[in-house]
Amino acid sequence: MLIDEAAEASSHISGMKLYLIVLSLLLAVFCVALDNTILSVAIPRITDEFHRLNDIGWYASAYLLTTCAFQLLYGKLYALFSTKWVFLVALCIFEVGSLICGVAPSSVVLIVGRAIAGVGSSGIFTGALVTIAHIVPLAKRPVYMGLLGGMYGIASVAGPLLGGAFTNEVTWRWCFYINLPVGGVTAVVILFLLRIPKSADLRTHGAWEMLKGLDPLGTIVFTPSIICVLLALQWGGVDYAWSNGRIIALFVLFGVLLITFIIIQVLMKDKATVPIKVASQRSVACASVFVFFIGASMFVMIYYVPIWFQAIRNQSPVQAGIDSIALILANTAGAIISGAVTNKTGHYAPWFIVSSVIMSIGAGCLTLFTVDIAQSKWIGFLFLYGIGVGFGFQQGAVAVQAVLPMAQVPIGTALIWFVQMLGGALFTSVAQNIFSTHLAENLANLQLPGLDPEAIVGAGATGFRQLVQPEYMDQVLVAYNAALLDVFQVALICSCLSILGAVGIEWRSVKQNR
């Protein structure tokens, strides 16, 4: 085995040492999740400074591309090498990327920094879950995973709020500088307090021999395949028509590389980046389906609910973040409640179904938003959706750790987190295309004199008001709201489809031996 099962119990800790390590992991996860959304508010100031409007899309996609592309590689690294040192290296890369972004003298340097930060971030959340697996007994892990899931949700929704505060009060560069002291605290705690015994294989063969088990061919094929599909979805229908040769070539290349990667995984067997016996294990496969769709639904809502507040209710990004607190609180409460109850009962499988059902009902309610909806309704709808997501957000990782031997937990955990991120990345791009297309169509159908649909689409969630004559504003808001509801319907469909994975989860208990 790659990880010595006999050493698992010896690495469990408790008391103040455990709390400090968990707190440091929460801080690291907070920074990683914050980076997904914090920049959205700062982009106008960045473009004012660098004068590169065409680079706006890359500020987010550079981070997202590398975050997704390196997920599975980190799973293999955590399986082969010291969890402590792999995590610290990932954190260091993330910090270097954040520093480059903070001091960036040009738009190109900022994009490079975002890409480097993404490489580091792809190993941090997985590393936090793997660390919990090492230091906490299986029966007690759900509540700690719930805390990590809750923190990720808090940071994702709070990003625009903090980004607005930094941009308005100091400088947009603090959107990145904030990661440095927080990451530094995490690094110090992990460096001095975390002690995980070396795996039997690492003690026997050494680091150089273990490097041969990294499946370099699989990584070389897999990484560009993910970049190709994400670029195709990022550009398709926005920068280039779907029929454009560039988009078609990217999709074809993605398909060829993905098929090649699967063949390599089959041939490599246990040495593969994702061994087939891990990916095909019933709970792992079903959890992957579940988290793909819950990730898709959640990220679509995280990005577009604040846009609804800004566009329809004419709120600032900061106020939109404040009004999204119902979603934050519900998500956090759901994650902690499900983790605590699972700790008590041992059963995690019911939460998959509960999450899918409540999340779907909440998403359905969000598709009922109107321009003049009452505050009590949108607060209740956001809370219902948020608690549904919270119930299931971390359950995939719990299921994987319950059914896989410790040697395969890092790979299974990385797979789950990769699929969850991929679902969010893919459907956020799909939602963007649907929103832009439907908004332009809705505005064109109004046939209002002097109204330029393309200009309004490009003006953003608040800037469009300056392009609309007051007497036409009510009609434009209805058209804008309808386009956003089409996006919410994408999240609703994904929420409903998550049940396909939920019903297949094996009914096991974290209180039983694997």
Curated annotation (Swiss-Prot):
The chain crosses the membrane at residues 13-33, 61-81, 85-105, 116-136, 146-166, 174-194, 218-238, 247-267, 289-309, 321-341, 351-371, 378-398, 411-431, 485-505. Induction: Expression is not regulated by the aflatoxin pathway aflR activator or aflS coactivator but by the fadA-dependent signaling pathway. One of its GO terms (cellular component) is plasma membrane. It holds the Pfam family MFS_1. Glycans are attached at N343. Gene3D superfamilies: MFS general substrate transporter like domains (1.20.1250.20), Multidrug resistance protein D (1.20.1720.10). Keywords: Cell membrane, Glycoprotein, Membrane, Transmembrane, Transmembrane helix, Transport. It is a multi-pass membrane protein. It is found in: Cell membrane. Its main location: membrane. One of its GO terms (molecular function) is transmembrane transporter activity. Disruption phenotype: Does not affect aflatoxin secretion. It comes from the Eukaryota. Belongs to the major facilitator superfamily. TCR/Tet family. Efflux pump; part of the gene cluster that mediates the biosynthesis of aflatoxins. PANTHER family: MAJOR FACILITATOR SUPERFAMILY, MFS AFLATOXIN EFFLUX PUMP. This is Efflux pump aflT. The gene is aflT.
